[in-house]
């Protein structure tokens, strides 16, 4: 098959070479964006007096026919035509005749593909923003039900201090809020039009770049044609934001996996988000949480891959940049799928309050409260820390917990202890007293929920 760019060549490549160089197998996902960009471009060509009205109407009609076929999955692509851009141009010429070849006037595939990807990522980013909000809403709904449900807080995966389960869930709300902000902020740099930059140096045709930018809903245009066609920062930024988002999802998935184990029994995943074993009838595996944890690495890989591609490229376009798309497409699919699954898991998980409550009563996570108690009575905190450490050791030797220790043992350790110590050591009291801003105290958690709901409502 003769290439649309084949004028200066004396022979064509063999099929296996075409196969290696072609991107149509994956960039066909840009078909709607490609046609959308072409419709804006040809509209501008008429406005600028470059093409006649009758030519433009023919081209528009053909493009709309192709768009409808694309939506129905009825377009037949050819590897010989390499990519989505040449495939659409060839299909357009087949549909309306030689006038279809005028569509590419004043445009290069270099600015065309960049435009397609800007349009694609803008749409996907906006959809991801909504999915992030869905997960945040699920976290808040669970938090509202568990303000006074206590759970051990951990450091080094060792029980540290009792906290409100709602407080733990809300930690992820705020992580996701930062993720939301990163995606939202990236739109400022993403929503800029490269269309009209040509191959690298602009064009001699009297095009109107601002007009096509307006038609496509962009906020402005790239100020430098070289930058316009060689920039992939917007994809890197998307992948970076996505990597952080997936990190946050993965961390909570790790906790859900632990919490749903027999060793913890803090939560139970809904059957819809778990699987069984082909050999062990008793098993209920948290597969969806494990998959999100595992898929996080795919997104990291896409980010590192693109950074590696870009780091040594001279300006402007290089064929290496064809490698920007598969990772982008994969990351979009992974992030959207993970967010949808995650929201469902959080909405439907069963919280085992009794097990959580038992856990905070059978540990030493209230020990810090003892040290604070002594410090408020004038003992230097470092000395109080030493006293309480010895009391914990005494309890371990006796096989009891701090609430079980007789007052006589407390008095022997320090005269500052009194009978009110047993009130102070109650896990619910320990949590309620953490009233510093952003703390786990019930009043603070309720404030945090109210603030989170206000954010979701805006």
UniProtKB/Swiss-Prot annotation:
Give the EC class as a word: lyase
| Compartments in which it is found | Cytoplasm
Is RNA-binding among the key words of this record? Answer: no
Query: Could you tell me the Gene Ontology terms of the biological process aspect for this record?
Result: arginine biosynthetic process via ornithine; L-arginine biosynthetic process
Q: Which reaction does it catalyse?
A: 2-(N(omega)-L-arginino)succinate = fumarate + L-arginine
Q: In which pathway does it act?
A: Amino-acid biosynthesis; L-arginine biosynthesis; L-arginine from L-ornithine and carbamoyl phosphate: step 3/3
Does the record carry Amino-acid biosynthesis as a key word? yes
Q: Which GO terms describe its molecular function?
A: argininosuccinate lyase activity
In terms of PANTHER family, this protein maps to: ARGININOSUCCINATE LYASE (PTHR43814:SF1)
List GO terms (cellular component aspect).
cytosol
Indicate the family of this protein: Belongs to the lyase 1 family. Argininosuccinate lyase subfamily.
A Pfam family that the UniProt record links to this protein: Lyase_1
Q: InterPro entries recorded for this chain?
A: Arg_succ_lyase_C, Argininosuccinate_lyase, Fumarase/histidase_N, Fumarate_lyase_CS, Fumarate_lyase_fam, Fumarate_lyase_N, L-Aspartase-like
Q: What is its EC number?
A: 4.3.2.1
Q: Which NCBIfam families match?
A: argH
Q: What protein name is recorded for this chain?
A: Argininosuccinate lyase
Q: Which HAMAP family match?
A: Arg_succ_lyase (MF_00006)
Keywords, alphabetical: Amino-acid biosynthesis, Arginine biosynthesis, Cytoplasm, Lyase
